[in-house]
Curated annotation (Swiss-Prot):
Molecular function as annotated in GO: structural constituent of ribosome
Organism: Calycanthus floridus var. glaucus
GO cellular component terms listed in the entry, alphabetical order: chloroplast; ribonucleoprotein complex; ribosome
Annotated compartments: Plastid, Chloroplast
Name this protein carries in UniProt: Large ribosomal subunit protein bL33c
Length: 66
């Protein structure tokens, strides 16, 4: 039997600080995390505070499109 859309989807979280600084070339790179989210519980874009190895501090990582 065919299922509908999967409830759990794989998402990519990207550092918002590095993404803004990427235009100015101040940062060495962009920190990204791969995780999963439940589409029914969190239909909106996910934002988590995670450690960025390029900024050397905890920053907000937001969900990006694939």
């Amino acid at each position: 039997m065919a299922k509908g859309k999967d409830v759990r989807v794989i998402i990519i979280l990207e550092c918002t600080g590095c993404a803004r600084n990427g235009l100015n070339k101040e940062s060495r790179g962009i920190s990204r995390y791969i995780t999963q989210k439940n589409r029914h519980n969190t239909p909106s874009r996910l934002e988590l505070k995670k450690f960025c190895s390029y900024c050397y501090k905890h920053t907000i990582h937001a969900e990006i499109k694939k």
